[in-house]
């Protein structure tokens, strides 16, 4: 795929240039953190590896760069090598470059940029370009009651570009616009013990892949004190995305979304974080399964694997008590440890006429968060649902 090769080469060039120390970067302090990796994921299983992290700090001991390359092993991916470079030029801006390649199927190349104070603080900008092959993806069929016995596997092979803008009309109110282009293909998966999705679910729409070109318009209300590590305030979002065949998409449909978040601090060390979201799709029955709404994974129902339940519409809600239990200087930075007991609820359904609350899946669990103000959050979330325990790791809060 020539386009894929061009993107990979561009990201490699950016990564190489990013590791060349500028005069400013050479003056930064460095802190080295050797970390063993023992990870578990409902879809990928157990992963073991070594993650040597290098922190680049300014004179105020604020992180400016993180170099986090690793080598890991998983029985699905084989040996998986990664290069990750994260940049934090200011409190309002951050960027990242990720290059990952396994010895088997999986690979991931991503370039991301975010600026919350663009054009004299009047515009928020987000951009993401990613090519990924994930051979551990699962599909159980459609519906809120899809059975574990219908589990199938496939490789998600997709290229996606996203640009998101928010123009501030007032300090707390913005108009938003998002444009995305996605090319998705379904290939044979990497889990030999599971049937291929095309064999287990032969009538599933989207097995032949699809091209999606979407234009989203919305309203944003935001009174949070911080977009990275919020402690108080609220967030409200209303969006409508048009995906027309006339713009090059494989079919025509419309997506609607609404989300509310609330953050309540008390007794200095505690923040009660709450979130509720509803998503609806208006369109034909042959909308590809990978474009329909789903619950499961680290951002929604943390006791189930990613995309465990799939259908046209969904409702999710979460609440967690972010509790700072420890704080000290570690590896040259002011680090905080948070414990966050949480509860997640969610349901998918086929029609807007259906109740989004009559058959909710519930998950309870505990999150471990490493917080380095003003921007960096790492998490390990362990959830218990009806199908057992699931664990997720990554960067940034789930909401």
Show which residues each predicted segment covers:
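C-terminal outer-membrane beta-barrel translocator/porin domains of Gram-negative envelope proteins
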Residues: 199-208, 212-337
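Solvent-exposed, glycine/polar-rich loop segments of beta-barrel outer-membrane systems
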Residues: 192-203, 288-300, 347-365
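Bacterial N-terminal signal peptides
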Residues: 9-19
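Membrane-embedded beta-strand positions of outer-membrane beta-barrel proteins
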Residues: 34-36, 67-71, 97-99, 125-129, ...
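Sec/Tat signal peptide C-region and signal peptidase I cleavage site
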Residues: 22-26
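C-terminal hydrophobic structural anchor segments
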Residues: 322-361
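Residues that define the transmembrane beta-barrel architecture of outer-membrane proteins
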Residues: 30-32, 44-48, 77-81, 105-109, ...
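Gram-negative/organellar outer-membrane beta-barrel architecture
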Residues: 27-34, 39-211, 377-378, 385-399
């Amino acid at each position: 795929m020539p386009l894929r090769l061009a993107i990979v080469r561009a990201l490699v060039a950016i990564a190489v240039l990013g590791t060349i120390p500028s005069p400013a970067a050479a003056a930064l302090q460095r802190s080295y953190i050797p970390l063993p990796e023992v990870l578990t994921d409902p879809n990928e299983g157990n992963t073991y590896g070594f993650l040597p992290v290098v922190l680049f700090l300014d004179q105020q001991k604020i992180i400016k760069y993180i170099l986090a390359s690793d080598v890991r092993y998983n029985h699905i991916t084989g040996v998986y090598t990664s290069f990750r470079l994260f940049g934090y030029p200011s409190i309002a801006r951050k960027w990242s470059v990720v290059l990952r390649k396994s010895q088997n199927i999986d690979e991931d190349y991503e370039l991301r940029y975010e600026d919350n104070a663009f054009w004299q603080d009047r515009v928020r900008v987000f951009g993401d370009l990613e090519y990924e092959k994930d051979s551990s993806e699962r599909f159980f069929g459609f519906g809120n009651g899809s059975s574990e016995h219908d589990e199938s596997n496939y490789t998600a092979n997709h290229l996606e570009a996203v640009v998101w803008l928010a123009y501030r009309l007032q300090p707390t109110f913005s108009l938003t616009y998002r444009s995305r282009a996605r090319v998705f293909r379904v290939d044979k998966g990497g889990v030999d013990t599971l049937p291929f999705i095309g064999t287990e679910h032969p009538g599933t729409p989207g097995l032949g892949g699809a091209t999606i070109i979407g234009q989203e318009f919305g309203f944003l209300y935001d009174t949070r004190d911080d977009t990275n590590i919020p402690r108080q305030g609220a967030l409200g979002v209303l969006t409508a995305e048009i995906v027309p065949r006339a713009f090059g998409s494989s079919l025509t449909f419309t997506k609607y979304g609404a989300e509310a978040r609330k953050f309540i601090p008390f007794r200095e060390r505690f923040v009660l974080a709450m979130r509720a979201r509803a998503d609806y799709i208006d369109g034909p029955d042959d909308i590809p399964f990978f474009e329909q709404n789903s619950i499961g994974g680290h951002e929604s129902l943390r006791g189930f694997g990613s995309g465990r339940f799939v259908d046209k519409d969904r409702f999710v809600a979460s609440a967690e008590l972010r509790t700072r239990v420890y704080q000290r200087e570690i590896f040259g930075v002011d680090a905080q440890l948070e414990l966050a007991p949480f509860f997640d609820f969610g349901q998918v359904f086929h029609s807007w006429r259906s109740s989004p609350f009559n058959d909710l899946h519930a998950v309870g669990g505990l999150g471990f968060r490493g917080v380095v103000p003003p921007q960096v959050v790492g998490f390990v979330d362990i959830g218990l649902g009806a199908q057992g325990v699931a664990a997720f790791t990554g960067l940034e809060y789930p909401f």
